[in-house]
Amino acid sequence: MKMSQQCRWPGKWSAFALFFSSALLSSPGFSQASLPASIQAENYSHMSGVQLEATSDSGGGQNVGWIEANDWMAYSSNPVTIPTTGAYDVEYRVASQAGGGSIRLEEAGGATNYGTITVPNTGGWQTWTTIKQRVNLTAGTHSFGIAIPAGGFNLNWFRITAVASSSSSSSSSVGWARLPAIKQSGAQWVNAANNQRVDLRGTNIGNWLIQEFWMMGGIMAHNGGTINDQCTLESVMSQRFGNAEKERLMKVFRDHYITTRDFDMMKAMGMNVIRIPFLYSLIEDEYNPYNVRPDAWQYLDWAINEAEKRGMYTILDLHGAVGGQAAASEQHDGCIGAAQLWTNANYWDRTKWLWDMIAQRYNGRSAVAAYDLLNEPWGTDATTLANRSYELFNVVRAKDASHIILLPGHNSGIDAYGNPNSRGLTNVATWMHFYPGLWGWNDTATYGAGQANMHANWLHCNSTATNPAGTGESCDWRNRINGIQTPFLVGEFQPWTLLGSYGGQMTRKTYDIYNSYGWAATNWAWKTTSSGGSNGDTSSWAWGMITNSSNGGGMSGINVSSASAAQIETWFRQFSTQPLVRNESIAYWMNWKAQTGQRIEAEMFKDHSGIRMETTTDTGGGFNAGSTDDNDWMSYPINIPTAGNYTLDVRVSSPYAGGTLVLSRNGADLGVVTVPNTGGWQNWQTATITVNLQAGQQDLAIFVRKGGWNINWWQLTKQ
């Protein structure tokens, strides 16, 4: 029996250890190590269960041996100063005859668990190797301890070194301007530096850091049929090639599916925020739980940086938690099957640990707009979701005091949260995913015009003289969000794929309306691919803003049960070089702005009161603005290049006479148009007057002095 066995507390630290750790750290003049910090294992301040022996490792001296489960060593006499919060590598010099042991790094006393690493079979008790784990540490003085979940090895020393991190909020070490942080102000997302509203409009990079195989046309298969979830793909590759080769192939996919050209194209299509869905095992070592992977932050860091270089924020979206959070039939959380996150205590604890790691990593990183705690958590009830989400909120807030944290919406809504502000929370937001026209939401509306009008009704609601702001449809959500004074994200929406030729303009209008409410919005999704690709015809477009081109970008399917590792690698590599095409209608409308000398579509107002939009039969198609009642209005930011007289043409229709349209600025009339009886709501005429305008950037408004007419477009031409 070991001499110290009589005074052991199995699996726990002693009260003496806790006292001794505190006493040493508070002693005047006590020396503290700076990084890199190497600590000889035998230099513990106190221990339980271990013994020392001479070592034949390089450098000589002693090693700690006779290590068994529940032993521990505390190093309170060797405190280490961590200069900044972030990632650090911890190396352990170990030897083992059989392997299977494990080391858990903790704060002395066990207050904080930094993760566990497995000790391999090194070939003998004095055959030494160095193993490494990556941990996140907070700035300050640490007194570390080593706990032993499983023994059977010797330990000579351990060493802590800093990892070069791209998560610093400083601009001095990067070649681009840092974005200002975003914070909550009531129901608004605002620039933390000047408190001005930030209109976030972006996309989701789906199928990259968590795969959804329908987004690649469903052309990946195995011997059991089509691959529908990432778990199936990884399982087949692991069984055939081993875990290490599977991991290498997954890295090839991630390196090639999204590249810098994607970020260039996102910026060119008017995006300023990118939601990044990821699977838990991108960060946590699935083979060694409670440990971050050696490459844990590679892809998130890279994406945050590439987005910020182009002036775009990021939202970090845990799309797939360990065990799965979605309903059993869903594949988007990584694995089809029961949502075990809600019933497995270990999975839930690991998810809290994961968010602790993320919060430590990106604390102070201003380019991260928000943390999205869980995507589409349909596998539980709304009350359980709310309670668990508040748990995650507290985990994150303990390590990151400033980032906005998104409380996930349930498929029944957000009411279970109550009002987050009543809990004294700050920088908290909520989200929902709105998919008009899909999955039972008016999905019988006809393709094209029918879908376009259904989307238009959702966006513009109903207004009356006593309630010009409107009720019904999206207005009810706006009123609910304003009532709780909490920012809101429409985390997913799809405004083009069923709308045909109307899709590009409806995409822009959706962003405009959501932003006018103060909401952020990210469409689903950035990219999809298919076997044949697209010839660029925007009247028939899939779910991605971009896709592979039919001109040289077609793809054949692959069976991963029979393809070689080299063939799978080649298939994955094609994504970085295949020709891509973007939806040019979306690109045009996302960059459209009102200008003199060309038609200004009336429905493309920035703000409005009481107006609706609908498809039009006028020449050129598209939409018109209508449902005009007295005192309604529409406003348009526009730059007038030179002062002087301009011809104002307005394209109007009405079954009545006596309507009055006023072009105004700051409430002052610039010109008045009397709208004639054109013979019907879709019988169009052009009315013309002259107006005098000042030069410069300004907001011009079309004011409805007397309603009962539609307007398709208007145009200002310098005389």
Q: Over which residues does each language-model region extend?
A:
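Sec/Tat signal peptide C-region and signal peptidase I cleavage site
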Residues: 27-31
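Aromatic-rich peripheral "rim/lid" segments of glycoside hydrolase catalytic domains that contact
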Residues: 502-595
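N-terminal secretory signal peptides that target proteins for export/translocation
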Residues: 1-10
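Extracellular glycoside hydrolase catalytic/binding regions
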Residues: 181-182, 343-519, 539
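Bacterial N-terminal signal peptides
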Residues: 14-26
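Glycan-binding loop/region signatures in secreted carbohydrate-active enzymes
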Residues: 204-255, 429-431, 436-476, 481, ...
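Extracytoplasmic
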Residues: 32-166, 172-175, 592-719
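Active-site mouth of glycoside hydrolases
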Residues: 179-192, 197-200, 205-404, 409-417
